[in-house]
């Protein structure tokens, strides 16, 4: 997943990720967490809210930067999957 999200410094908002299964098979997300970092330094981390096939993360970046990374780790059945999103703060 190569997605990019923009924030204006001072914003506090939700990022929603939709998880899809290959071949539209039914599935359940059993757990999900995130890390929000810049150059390897973690600024925020926690659990995602799970709503059916959506993962909800609320972020409030502390500094302007073009290079934040949001990494989401979630579990479906017996597999662990990850998604990365680039976050720019202007």
Write out the residue ranges for each language-model feature.
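Contiguous segments within soluble domain cores/interaction surfaces
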Residues: 1-90
